[in-house]
């Protein structure tokens, strides 16, 4: 069987599928444009290990490994805050794990497809180094405060 012989989805099924994907995912270009606007309306979370974050992360992202996503670490954020999560790239399921945890906690979430690798492939620079101290972290959305209990 090849693509010409396979039955394609009807247009409504395709529309439903792709609209659902767009409600769950965003891409590096959209995140970059939103961050550049100065008022993205979301909190960008790098959910990788501390070493990966220090090695290079999306500017403006906060570090919260997917295993540390819990109500206590989200308590400072308004319930309607949108979180955009990313991990290393398509070979990593950390963003999926983070998104599932956030959704389980009743939080709005999207995954940035491509992750840190996709960010680089699109030609955007990663920032190196450890996260800035908690008391100087500026909210990327202007609506939230730093993660409580986060080193």
Each predicted region: which residue ranges?
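Flexible, polar/low-complexity N-terminal or interdomain linker segments that lie immediately upstream
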Residues: 1-44, 48-55, 129-151
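Short loop/helix-cap segments at secondary-structure boundaries that form the rim of catalytic
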Residues: 53-59, 119
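Short, hinge-like loop/turn segments at secondary-structure boundaries
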Residues: 62, 80, 126-130
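Short active-site oxyanion
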Residues: 38-44, 59-60, 82, 108
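Residue-level "edge-of-site" marker
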Residues: 66, 115, 132
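Catalytic cysteine-centered active loop of the rhodanese-like fold, especially the PTP/DSP P-loop
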Residues: 74-120
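A contiguous binding-surface segment within folded domains or other stable secondary-structure elements
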Residues: 58-67
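Alpha-helical scaffolding within the catalytic cores
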Residues: 68-73
